[in-house]
């Protein structure tokens, strides 16, 4: 919290409780750290945090860091069994949580150093506020160990894994970020992404380092976000693509009613932005969209600037300074420009291997991102699809992402996803799941014809299922595992070809939204 000395009374956060200054954050986190140390918390022990976006989250992180602990950021969508599994695996000695998760935490043994409420509906001795009131606000002794942060993977393919990091060995990657995205000192940043997510956490840390003001809310609402951008004269907004899409769905009039002239940066990551959404966002807000390609494990790889997106809105941009990106074929040889290959990334901010054991594939000291892509002559990277999602249909390689992006560009389609399914004739074919725009009508044959008119025949989905919504995790990634499980159970029947709003659609959507 060296920033507190430099930024003092400047606001570090505005949340639903009001304003919090850097000085207050420093003093409150000193008090929390001292209170926890009195309760026996030691360097190297584990502090788990289950909280939404508010000051309590940030206070818990900085207090735990001042104690030199292992900080584990829990996903707020986890069910009780997942919480128990992660807490046991990561070693939780102290737990910080919001009141709304009390039921989720039932049946979980109290950690040895206690559990404390960050967002409390009712006051009590177990709240962070109560600990702060009775504790010394002077700086705690320097811990014996440096703090470590563990961010959990999204869990889209199974049980979330812990991806730990120690203090950064170099600031080169942050320098690379700032060379691509013009974040400045004293930004006012509308931080919509959950801070337990890699993108949200990193932008919170970068913001604090720059003396910025973070504007946060516990739940995302698109219209409230627009109001907040105008009210606080925000200069930057950090979102995942599905959030940006929901803002744009409000319509041109709602956006133009607000004075957003201060907004210089819309920083997007967390899942694929897509060319159509990139175009629409640029049309609505101007050339302020920056698209980051990276992950919890590999950190930053590339960033598409407004100039890159103007040249081609489907690109994820050029390699960030401080990172290395290479593409390899199945034999481990680097592929020529323009050819697809597995994406491998190297930098000094990558994770240290999963806490439960295992790691990502490594080649020549570089880490696999899990995606396949290609470079254009200007050095811009394009994502062709997930390495593990590619199917072979009639001897041809097919990536669902290409079909998904095409379907999303249809005027009647809100969003779409595709998975590979077995096919007697072709070996594998795609199955598409489509969400229509409000009051739109589209038949299965019309969807197939649209793909056939724009892509090769072997990329046309064998089936099309219409849903009310796609199953997603809290940061907007489509849970294709759930779609595949439904297909294996025989629940994913194609909708009748006469009308995309057929009665069977409700049956499909009910299953898609159950969690």
Where are these regions (language model features)?
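Conserved pre-ATP/AMP-binding loop-to-beta segment of ANL
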Residues: 9, 123-125, 129, 133-152, ...
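Conserved AMP-binding/adenylate-forming core of the ANL superfamily
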Residues: 11-54, 58, 62, 79-84
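Conserved ATP/PPi-binding loop(s) of AMP-dependent carboxylate-activating enzymes
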Residues: 318-322, 333-364, 396-398
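AMP-binding/adenylate-forming catalytic core of the ANL superfamily
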Residues: 56, 78, 97, 227-229, ...
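Conserved AMP-binding/adenylation subdomain of ANL enzymes
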Residues: 171-188, 196-236, 250
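Conserved structural elements of the adenylate-forming
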Residues: 26-31, 162-185, 245-248
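Gly/Ser/Thr-rich phosphate-binding loop
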Residues: 209, 234-238, 250-312, 324, ...
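Conserved AMP-binding A3 loop
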Residues: 21-23, 148-172
